């Protein structure tokens, strides 16, 4: 059953579909990651609340994508992607110091990152038990670490929105860096990927292939990996709202940047209104002068 159309009960008085529940689960994972990365030992309650609030406001935190949820009746499968912005920022600072020969620059600490801590079996089990109390059924939880925010539209929109909340950042520079810093294939590489998919011959299976010796070739995961979208080819970021620093004028701005091959080519329509090879992500934020919205579109080949 597709997760877009599945439905379940939070309780017997309140029925919600799974897309609505995905937002709740996303906030649950984000809150769990925030609390686990705050030191609460021998600290007063007021200091703990202040530390958690500061952790939520920082840009170098763990970002969680909107979970992909499937309801199989007896169990629920939840898949979410994680991105560690603190680890990426430390790596970028180390590369910049090495490039300019600054030996006195602080080096990234060698140890466990925020995401690796969450991927431990002990922490995953605790998080899964919390979800099982919500769903009232077994939960199959899968957390996947991403190396770049441009690999998921939800994470990229959240990163851009968090950076725009800081008044020291220029909106145009934030949106430009989110698009042009993405490592994307050129037009020739995209053409080769599409051509290779078109030339791929359909596989025909025999009854002898569905044996224990050939399980690796005929299981559902291997087949889905062959037909799935292989690579991000374009990134588009758009921001609209109160992005200016002026307080006297009730003025709205719109900034947009795009990078990579075009994603306007013909593609199969998903759910009647959306292209299957384009992933969209939306986020919003608030500055001192008002609110703004972020829209991200990732094209795939």
Regions found by a protein language model. Name each.
Residues 1-301:
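Ribosome-associated RNA-binding proteins
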């Amino acid at each position: 059953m597709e997760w877009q159309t599945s439905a379940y009960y939070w309780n017997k008085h309140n029925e919600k579909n799974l897309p609505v529940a995905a937002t709740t689960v996303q906030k649950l994972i984000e809150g769990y990651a925030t609390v686990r990365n705050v030191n609460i030992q021998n600290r007063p309650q007021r200091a703990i609340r202040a530390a958690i609030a500061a952790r939520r406001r920082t840009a170098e935190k763990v970002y969680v994508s909107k979970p992909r949820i499937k309801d199989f009746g007896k169990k629920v499968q939840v898949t979410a992607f994680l991105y560690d912005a603190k680890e990426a920022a430390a790596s970028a600072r180390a590369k910049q110091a090495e490039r300019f020969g600054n030996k006195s620059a602080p080096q990234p600490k060698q140890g466990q990152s925020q995401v690796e801590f969450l991927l431990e079996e002990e922490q995953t089990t605790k998080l899964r038990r919390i979800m099982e109390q919500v769903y009232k059924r077994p939960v199959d939880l899968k957390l996947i670490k991403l190396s770049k925010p441009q690999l998921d539209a939800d994470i990229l929109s959240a990163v851009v929105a968090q950076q725009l909340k800081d008044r020291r950042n220029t909106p145009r520079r934030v949106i430009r860096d989110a698009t042009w810093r993405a490592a994307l294939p050129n037009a020739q590489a995209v053409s080769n990927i599409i051509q290779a998919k078109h030339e791929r011959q359909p596989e025909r299976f025999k009854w002898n292939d569905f044996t224990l010796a050939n399980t690796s070739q005929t299981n559902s995961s291997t087949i889905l990996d062959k037909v799935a979208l292989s690579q991000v080819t374009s990134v588009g970021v758009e921001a609209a709202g109160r992005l200016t620093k002026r307080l006297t004028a009730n003025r709205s701005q719109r900034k947009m940047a795009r990078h990579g091959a075009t994603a306007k080519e013909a593609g199969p329509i998903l759910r009647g209104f959306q292209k299957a090879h384009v992933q969209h992500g939306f986020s919003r934020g608030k500055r001192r002068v008002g609110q703004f919205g972020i829209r991200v579109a990732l094209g795939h080949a």
